[in-house]
Regions:
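Helix-adjacent hinge/juxtasegments
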Residues: 56-57, 65-81
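Residue-level marker for the onset of beta-strands and adjacent loop->beta junctions
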Residues: 7, 43, 75, 114-116
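Vicinal oxygen chelate
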Residues: 1-2, 88-117
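Short, charged/polar surface micro-motifs in flexible loops or helix N-caps
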Residues: 50-54, 61-62, 84
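Short, conserved charged micro-motifs
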Residues: 18, 84-88
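Core segments of cupin and vicinal oxygen chelate
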Residues: 11-54, 93
């Protein structure tokens, strides 16, 4: 077996309009496919950012994920950016709440990378 890379990550959301606005208008993803699946009464939106794909299922009445990091399931998505301070500023200007920038000493081999949660 020789896995080359992760093709996509699939996540669930509950609000079609807010989800699409967040990923497309605020984060800059491109919609590559979008379907309403009548038999399941949900939307499937395939998004692309560079070489990465995100598959979003917008499902009515999906159970909420517990709001603490140790809950099972997807914990976070991480993005590579050129200037983290500028990126955080622009996210905040778009109404996206961010946490303080911090050094991540566990996953980074040098102090050249910062993480904003």
């Amino acid at each position: 077996m020789n896995f080359q890379h992760i093709h996509h990550v699939a996540i669930l959301a509950s609000d079609y309009k807010k989800t699409k606005e967040f990923y497309v208008e605020k984060l800059g993803f491109e919609v590559i496919r979008e379907n309403y699946r009548e038999d399941r009464e949900d939307y499937k939106i395939d998004l692309q950012l560079g070489d990465s794909e995100l598959e979003v299922f917008v499902v009515k009445n999906a159970p909420a994920r517990p709001n603490y990091p140790e809950a099972l399931g997807l914990r976070h998505l991480a993005f590579t950016v050129e200037d983290i301070e500028d990126t955080v500023k622009r996210l905040n200007e778009k109404g996206i709440e961010t946490e303080p920038i911090r050094w991540d000493t566990y996953t980074n081999k040098s102090k050249q990378k910062k993480v904003a949660k």
